[in-house]
């Protein structure tokens, strides 16, 4: 039995040496002496500090020189489509209101339903075309101003809105141009003020402190 045990130990050590596991290793005392100053305990599955795996901000894979925010050209598609859908929905509701008002003296019948449906379709198409045209002009002016100035800020928004109103009302003469420009200037200024309200509020609070 003793001879068998010795032969078994020899075969085990031979296999261990063959697979490279028979070399000298580090004891627990040696590993305990390795300093980990300023580091959290390492994960048993990762050979890195887990603190460096936490990302506070979103990361994007972008080409060299690309921006993380969408430009005027990318937002133009969303703006035009959203305005068309909003105009169609508002026009449909307005057409339904007008249709019910104009046919209130008629009994519920097929002619009345057809007349209401025609009013809904007409008003929906009218408002969708109007808002879509305004969005197209606004987006085109915004892209042109952005490419010309080489910057994207609230000044582009206000300028694009003013020029859109002036061009849309250019058929009404100088008075129509002035009214359209004033309307565009007012709406875009309110929009820019709304977008910067949080930043302005924070700045005022810091100044008051």
UniProtKB/Swiss-Prot annotation:
Disruption phenotype: Mutants are not viable. Heterozygous animals show an aneurological phenotype, premature aging and reduced lifespan. Its main location: mitochondrion. InterPro entries: Tim23, Tim23-like. One of its GO terms (molecular function) is protein transmembrane transporter activity. Keywords: Membrane, Mitochondrion, Mitochondrion inner membrane, Protein transport, Translocation, Transmembrane, Transmembrane helix, Transport. GO terms for cellular component: migrasome; mitochondrial inner membrane; mitochondrial intermembrane space; mitochondrion; TIM23 mitochondrial import inner membrane translocase complex. It is a multi-pass membrane protein. It is found in: Mitochondrion inner membrane. The keyword Manganese does not apply. It comes from the Eukaryota. The chain crosses the membrane at residues 73-93, 125-145, 181-197. GO terms for biological process: protein import into mitochondrial matrix; type 2 mitophagy. Component of the TIM23 complex at least composed of TIMM23, TIMM17 (TIMM17A or TIMM17B) and TIMM50; within this complex, directly interacts with TIMM50. The complex interacts with the TIMM44 component of the PAM complex and with DNAJC15. Upon mitochondrial depolarization, interacts with PINK1; the interaction is required for PINK1 accumulation at the outer mitochondrial membrane, kinase activation by autophosphorylation and PRKN recruitement to mitochondria. NCBIfam families: 3a0801s02tim23. Belongs to the Tim17/Tim22/Tim23 family. Essential component of the TIM23 complex, a complex that mediates the translocation of transit peptide-containing proteins across the mitochondrial inner membrane. Has a role in the activation of stress-induced mitophagy by protecting PINK1 from OMA1-mediated degradation and facilitating its accumulation at the outer mitochondrial membrane in response to depolarization. This is Mitochondrial import inner membrane translocase subunit Tim23. It comes from Mus musculus (Mouse).
